[in-house]
């Protein structure tokens, strides 16, 4: 039973690439044809590549690994958050803060600050502070929550990244590569697939296409986690 059907991919518009003038020649092997100035992605390869990515993610989750879901473009923000939360993983869906991976210690410090502010709000500290200061602290908390909320409980570097539009998330790609963290990504016709360990050729601009593929990656995590629980109960 394959992970995804051609019908699902077609209905979600996964086959629509970018305009032909905005392309990366390295994506040529994944292009089926050109129609009305737009490249059409070869969905047979999408099926194959998604299956490879699915197996990789499932095995990783089975071994207790973690995945960081990354997608900050408007079309990806909701899917990234929803699917990462559904499978109990971490996400970045606002702005990628430079150093999120390569300077993780500093990022952990900012997360610690977020936790402190949350605690202050909960234990009544805010009630006894001057109103002006509380407004300032609440603003700081909201800002930290916005950018770091999705990685608040990420204790160490992730085992892998799942990225929507690696061209837009070039900093995340560079950081993961420098730390040799494997990358799974949806690569559209304007991306460089050679930078990605598990490229999934597909439309990274349509909400439905992004949601479909992101949900399959989350499914792989869930399936892998069930395998991990099963293995633990067998011991």
Curated annotation (Swiss-Prot):
Q: Where is the signal peptide?
A: none
* Coiled-coil segments on the chain, per record: none
Which CDD domains does this one have?
RPS2
Q: Which GO terms describe its molecular function?
A: structural constituent of ribosome
| A GO CC term assigned to this protein in UniProt | cytosolic small ribosomal subunit
State any GO BP term from the record. translation
Report the PANTHER family cross-referenced here.
30S RIBOSOMAL PROTEIN S2 PROKARYOTIC AND ORGANELLAR, SMALL RIBOSOMAL SUBUNIT PROTEIN US2M
Q: What is this protein called?
A: Small ribosomal subunit protein uS2
Recite the lineage of the species: Bacteria, Bacillati, Bacillota, Clostridia, Thermoanaerobacterales
> What gene is it encoded by?
rpsB
